C-alpha cells in the first residue's frame, strides 16, 4: 500500500542497523523460537510493544500493491499475531512506555511486479529497533513474495504479554537477513484417493506459508477417482466418487489464485500412462479393454487427444512453469494381453517397455507444446533416461542414490525419497525429515545447482479431511527448515532443534492448525496430559 500518510522519523538503512556477528551457538539459536531458522540473525535484550493501530507503510517502495497482495499479507500477519489471546490492555498508553511503542512496519520492495515466477528472489531483510531507535520496524525485499516471508518471520517475534495483555517483541533490536537455500520447497496433496474440500486445501496452503514452503503439488487424479472438471472432455469427471466430490474448473482456478496471493505455486499432476483407470469411467475408449483397464491405451490417438485437451485446459489456469506427468509404477501387461494393442505393438516393432517410452515421450511433447516444462517420476529416468527431453525434471521417490545419477546426466531433480519424506509413512519420526539432505553424496557445484529442492508427500490412501493436518504437521516443518536454512546453520543432530520445533508446533496449534505432538511418528495422539511444549 503506497502513501498511507504516516510519517517515519529517522528510519535508518538496514545495513547500518545490522549488528556485526550472527547467532552461532545452538543454545542461543534455540532461544530464538523462529522456524525455519533465518540465514543471519542478531538480537539484543530489550522489549517493544505493538501499537494498537500498528500500521503498514510503504513510502519509498517501487511496489504499488495494486492487487493488494502485500496489504492482505500484512492483515493476515496481524490476524495470527492477535489470534491466541484477547488483547484487552491499552496498547497506546504510557503504561507500555511511549518510547517502547512500535507504531508500524515500513516495507520497501524494489520490484514493481507481483508476477509469481519460479526462481524469483525470495530474500528479505528485517529490522526491529530498540526502544531508543525509530518507532517503525523495517522490512526490505526484492519482491512482494520475499516480503511475505519477512512478515511470517515478524509474526514469530511477536508474543502476548500476560500482565499488560498486549503484544510485545522481546530481545530487541532484531536484525535478520534471510533467503531460501532451495527454490523448490514442496508439499504434495492427493485428492484422488480421498477428496479434500476447498476449505481444507486452503487451510493447507495457509499452513504452508507459516513454514515458508512454496510449491503445492496437487496430485489431482489417480486410479481411484477423477474429481476435476475438464471442459474439453466433460465426461472425465464421471470418474469422481460422487457428484459432491468434484472440483469445478473455477474451483481449481480459485485454489491457484489463493495460493498465488500467498507466494505459493500450484503444480498440477496427471499421472500417465499408469494410475489412470478413473479416466475410462467417462471415456471407456481410453482403456485397453473393459476387462483390462490400465494403463491408458498406447495405441489410440484418442488417448493423446485427451491428454492434449487436459493440458490445454490446464494452461489456462495452472500458470506454474512446470506440469507433472507422473509416469511411475506402469504395469504394461494389459497392452500385450489386449489383442488389438498387441497387434499394434507388433506392427510398430515395439516391446512393452518401448511402448512405455513412446507414451511418456509423446506426452512430454504435448506438454511442451502448451509451454510447460515437465516433471516425471524417477522410473522414466531409470528406464530411458537418455531419451527424456532435456527440459525434464526427474522426481526422485524410490532410490536415495538416484539424485547423484540424475544430476550427473545433466538433468534437474526434485528429492522426495520415500524412506524420509513420505508423510503417509506414519511410523517415520520428524528427526528423519529434518536430517534428509538433498545434496547427499553430491559435492560438485554444477550437480548441486541441478537439485531444485525437495518435497514432502502426503499421499491420500489413509488420510482425509479429518486428519490431514496432523499427518502433515509438524513433520513437514522439519523438512521445511532443511530446504530453507543454509546448510551450515542446520543442526547436525536433529534433537538439538527439539525445543524450537516444539514451540513452532504450539504456534501452529495457536493458529488453528491441528499439528500433532512431536513424540513418536506421524499423527500420534498426546501420550498423557501435559503441555504442547513437552509433547
Curated annotation (Swiss-Prot):
Position of the signal peptide: 1-24
User: What do mutants without this gene show?
Assistant: Reduced amounts of paucimannosidic N-glycans-containing glycoproteins in roots and leaves.
- GO MF terms on file? beta-N-acetylhexosaminidase activity; hexosaminidase activity
The alphabetized UniProt keywords are: Cell membrane, Disulfide bond, Glycoprotein, Glycosidase, Hydrolase, Membrane, Signal
Task: Please describe the post-translational modifications of this protein.
Answer: N-glycosylated.
> What is stated about the way this protein's activity is regulated?
Slightly inhibited by N-acetylcastanospermine.
Specify whether Glycoprotein is a keyword of the entry.
yes
Locations listed in the record: Cell membrane
Q: EC?
A: 3.2.1.52
Q: Which cysteines are joined by disulfide bonds?
A: 292-334, 506-532
Q: What InterPro entries does the database record attribute to this sequence?
A: Beta_hexosaminidase_sua/sub, Glyco_hydro_20_cat, Glycoside_hydrolase_SF, Hex-like_dom2, HEX_eukaryotic_N
Q: Which residues are glycosylated according to the annotation?
A: 92, 331, 405, 441, 496
Q: Which Pfam families does the UniProt entry name for this protein?
A: Glyco_hydro_20 (PF00728), Glycohydro_20b2 (PF14845)
What catalytic activity is recorded? Hydrolysis of terminal non-reducing N-acetyl-D-hexosamine residues in N-acetyl-beta-D-hexosaminides
> What GO CC annotations are associated with the protein?
nucleus; plasma membrane
Active-site residue numbers: 329 (proton donor)
The record's pH note reads: Optimum pH is 4-5.
Tissues in which the UniProt entry reports expression: Expressed in roots, leaves, stems, flowers and siliques.
Mind listing the GO biological process terms from this record? carbohydrate metabolic process
- Does the record carry Transmembrane as a key word? no
The similarity annotation says:
Belongs to the glycosyl hydrolase 20 family.
Q: Which PANTHER family does the entry link to?
A: BETA-HEXOSAMINIDASE, BETA-HEXOSAMINIDASE A
Role description: Has a broad substrate specificity. Can use synthetic substrates such as pyridylaminated chitotriose, p-nitrophenyl-beta-N-acetylglucosaminide, p-nitrophenyl-2-acetamido-2-deoxy-beta-D-glucopyranoside (pNP-GlcNAc), p-nitrophenyl-2-acetamido-2-deoxy-beta-D-galactopyranoside (pNP-GalNAc), 4-methylumbelliferyl-2-acetamido-2-deoxy-beta-D-glucopyranoside (MU-GlcNAc), and 4-methylumbelliferyl-6-sulfo-2-acetamido-2-deoxy-beta-D-glucopyranoside (MU-GlcNAc-6SO(4)) as substrates.
Q: What is this protein called?
A: Beta-hexosaminidase 3
Source organism of this protein record: Arabidopsis thaliana
Encoding gene per record: HEXO3
Amino acid at each position: 500500500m503506497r502513501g498511507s500518510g504516516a510519517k517515519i522519523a529517522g528510519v535508518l538503512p538496514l545495513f547500518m542497523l545490522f549488528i556485526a556477528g550472527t547467532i552461532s551457538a545452538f543454545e542461543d539459536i534455540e532461544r530464538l523460537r523462529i522456524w525455519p531458522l533465518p540465514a543471519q540473525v542478531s538480537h539484543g535484550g530489550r522489549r517493544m510493544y505493538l501499537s494498537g493501530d500498528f500500521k503498514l507503510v510503504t513510502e519509498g517502495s517501487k511496489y504499488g500493491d495494486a492487487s493488494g497482495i502485500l496489504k492482505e499479507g500484512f492483515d493476515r500477519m496481524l490476524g495470527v499475531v492477535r489470534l491466541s489471546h484477547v488483547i484487552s490492555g491499552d496498547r497506546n498508553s504510557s503504561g507500555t512506555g511511549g518510547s517502547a511503542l512500535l507504531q508500524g512496519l515500513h516495507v520497501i520492495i524494489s520490484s514493481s511486479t507481483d508476477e509469481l515466477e519460479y526462481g524469483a528472489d525470495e530474500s528479505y531483510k528485517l529490522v526491529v529497533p530498540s526502544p531508543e531507535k525509530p518507532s517503525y520496524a523495517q522490512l526490505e525485499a526484492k519482491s512482494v513474495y520475499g516480503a511475505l516471508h519477512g512478515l511470517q518471520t515478524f509474526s514469530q517475534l511477536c508474543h502476548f504479554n500476560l500482565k499488560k495483555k498486549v503484544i510485545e517483541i522481546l530481545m530487541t533490536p532484531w536484525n535478520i537477513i534471510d533467503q531460501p537455500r532451495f527454490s523448490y520447497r514442496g508439499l504434495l496433496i492427493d485428492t484422488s484417493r480421498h477428496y479434500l474440500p476447498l476449505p481444507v486445501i486452503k487451510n493447507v496452503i495457509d499452513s504452508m506459508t507459516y513454514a515458508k514452503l512454496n510449491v503445492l503439488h496437487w496430485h489431482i487424479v489417480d486410479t481411484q477417482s477423477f474429481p476435476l472438471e475438464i471442459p474439453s472432455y466433460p465426461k472425465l469427471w464421471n470418474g469422481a466418487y460422487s457428484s459432491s466430490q468434484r472440483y469445478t474448473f473455477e474451483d481449481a482456478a480459485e485454489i491457484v489464485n489463493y495460493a498465488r496471493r500467498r507466494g505459493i505455486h500450484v503444480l498440477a499432476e496427471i499421472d500417465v500412462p499408469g494410475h489412470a483407470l478413473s479416466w475410462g469411467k467417462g471415456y471407456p475408449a481410453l482403456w485397453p479393454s473393459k476387462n483390462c483397464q490400465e494403463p491408458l491405451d498406447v495405441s489410440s490417438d484418442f488417448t493423446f487427444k485427451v491428454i492434449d485437451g487436459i493440458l490445454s485446459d490446464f494452461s489456462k489456469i495452472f500458470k506454474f512453469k512446470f506440469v507433472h506427468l507422473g509416469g511411475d509404477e506402469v504395469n504394461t501387461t494389459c497392452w500385450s494381453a489386449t489383442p488389438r494393442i498387441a497387434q499394434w505393438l507388433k506392427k510398430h516393432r515395439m516391446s512393452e517397455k518401448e511402448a512405455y517410452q513412446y507414451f511418456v515421450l509423446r506426452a512430454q511433447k504435448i506438454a511442451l507444446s502448451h509451454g510447460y516444462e515437465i516433471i516425471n517420476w524417477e522410473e522414466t529416468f531409470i528406464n530411458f533416461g537418455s531419451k527424456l527431453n532435456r527440459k525434464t525434471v526427474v522426481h526422485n521417490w524410490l532410490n536415495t542414490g538416484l539424485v547423484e545419477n540424475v544430476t550427473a546426466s545433466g538433468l534437474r531433480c526434485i528429492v522426495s525419497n520415500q524412506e524420509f519424506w513420505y508423510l503417509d509413512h506414519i511410523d517415520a519420526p520428524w528427526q528423519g525429515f529434518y536430517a534428509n539432505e538433498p545434496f547427499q553424496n553430491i559435492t560438485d557445484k554444477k550437480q548441486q545447482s541441478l537439485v531444485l529442492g525437495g518435497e514432502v508427500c502426503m499421499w491420500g490412501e489413509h488420510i482425509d479431511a479429518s486428519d490431514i493436518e496432523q499427518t502433515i504437521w509438524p513433520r513437514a516443518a522439519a523438512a521445511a527448515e532443511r530446504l530453507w536454512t543454509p546448510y551450515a546453520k542446520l543442526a547436525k543432530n536433529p534433537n538439538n532443534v527439539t525445543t524450537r520445533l516444539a514451540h513452532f508446533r504450539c504456534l501452529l496449534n495457536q493458529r488453528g492448525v491441528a499439528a500433532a505432538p512431536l513424540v513418536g511418528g506421524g499423527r500420534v495422539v498426546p501420550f498423557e496430559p501435559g503441555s504442547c511444549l513437552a509433547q
